[in-house]
């Protein structure tokens, strides 16, 4: 996943869930 979990309601879980 990318480190763009700074712009989203559930993208904060991009730690290893979202892309």
Curated annotation (Swiss-Prot):
Signal peptide: none annotated. There is a cross-link at residues 4-14 (Lanthionine (Ser-Cys)). Maturation of lantibiotics involves the enzymatic conversion of Thr, and Ser into dehydrated AA and the formation of thioether bonds with cysteine or the formation of dialkylamine bonds with lysine. This is followed by membrane translocation and cleavage of the modified precursor. GO terms for molecular function: signaling receptor binding. There is a cross-link at residues 1-18, 5-11 (Beta-methyllanthionine (Cys-Thr)). It holds the Pfam family DurB-like. It is found in: Secreted. The keyword Secreted applies. Coiled coil: none annotated. The keyword Secreted applies. The modification (3R)-3-hydroxyaspartate is found at residue 15. Keywords: Antibiotic, Antimicrobial, Bacteriocin, Hydroxylation, Lantibiotic, Secreted, Thioether bond. There is a cross-link at residues 6-19 (Lysinoalanine (Ser-Lys)). GO terms for biological process: defense response to bacterium; killing of cells of another organism. GO terms for cellular component: extracellular region. Is a potent inhibitor of human phospholipase A2. Exhibits only a weak antibacterial activity against B.subtilis, and does not display antimicrobial activity against S.aureus, S.mitis, E.coli, K.pneumoniae, P.vulgaris and C.albicans. Belongs to the type B lantibiotic family. This is Lantibiotic duramycin B. It comes from Streptomyces sp. (strain R2075).
């Amino acid at each position: 996943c990318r480190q763009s979990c700074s712009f989203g309601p559930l993208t904060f879980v991009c730690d290893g869930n979202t892309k």
